[in-house]
Amino acid sequence: MSSIGTGYDLSASTFSPDGRVFQVEYAMKAVENSSTAIGIRCKDGVVFGVEKLVLSKLYEEGSNKRLFNVDRHVGMAVAGLLADARSLADIAREEASNFRSNFGYNIPLKHLADRVAMYVHAYTLYSAVRPFGCSFMLGSYSVNDGAQLYMIDPSGVSYGYWGCAIGKARQAAKTEIEKLQMKEMTCRDVVKEVAKIIYIVHDEVKDKAFELELSWVGEITNGRHEIVPKDVREEAEKYAKESLKEEDESDDDNM
């Protein structure tokens, strides 16, 4: 009975006999059904890429963004329920703002990730609330700490990463990320690879149209989190499409 959650999945405060909290697992399912987001840390910054699915031709271009500014030096990429993610982005902004007001300098990313992770975890403890149905990555760059990247999942666990992927194609994306020499690459190099990975893992059969969202924070932006300029994004998309075309042609030749 416990293996399918019968009777034990009604509340986030209830454990099943085999030690599982089904509401948290269901929240993770919401993330797994979402479009893919990846973050890669390199020697001079962090680059985020998001496959934002376009569910209707009537949507205005650029709406429902999945990349957020949390602070001047911190960016956030999300997968899962967008409304939940926006709520957590506001919480993260409040934490960053309060820290600067109290201490007079930018919040360290490790501290911010831990604070928001504790907030997310609190929503897995009580029957009156439900877990957040999203995972998100936080990235920053500073002269003292260098590039940093953290991921927080619906259970409230926070991990530091060199490369991370969340969403429906996370396994395929992680496989591609592992092929990269991230510690030797710059943000300019990584932007192209991020675009390429998003195009590789995109499922053209199930999900026809998508918008590629790219942002970065690093030396190239003087430590500020910014959306990648249009010309750089278009160059990255062109590189991604050409790489895919070359791979398809080589596969055809091998056959």
From Swiss-Prot:
Transmembrane residue ranges: none
Quaternary data: The 26S proteasome consists of a 20S proteasome core and two 19S regulatory subunits. The 20S proteasome core is a barrel-shaped complex made of 28 subunits that are arranged in four stacked rings. The two outer rings are each formed by seven alpha subunits, and the two inner rings are formed by seven beta subunits. The proteolytic activity is exerted by three beta-subunits PSMB5, PSMB6 and PSMB7. Interacts with AURKB. Interacts with CDKN1A. Interacts with MDM2 and RB1. Interacts with the C-terminus of TBXA2R isoform 2. Interacts with DNAJB2.
Protein name: Proteasome subunit alpha type-3
Compartment list: Cytoplasm; Nucleus
Organism expressing this protein natively: Bos taurus (Bovine)
Keyword Acetylation: yes
GO cellular component, one term: nucleus
Protein family: Belongs to the peptidase T1A family.
N-acetylserine PTM sites in chain numbering: 2
Modified residues (N6-acetyllysine): 57, 206, 230
Phosphoserine modifications at: 243, 250
Entry's Gene Ontology BP terms: proteasome-mediated ubiquitin-dependent protein catabolic process
Keyword annotations: Acetylation, Cytoplasm, Nucleus, Phosphoprotein, Proteasome
Role noted for this protein: Component of the 20S core proteasome complex involved in the proteolytic degradation of most intracellular proteins. This complex plays numerous essential roles within the cell by associating with different regulatory particles. Associated with two 19S regulatory particles, forms the 26S proteasome and thus participates in the ATP-dependent degradation of ubiquitinated proteins.
CDD domains in alphabetical order: proteasome_alpha_type_3
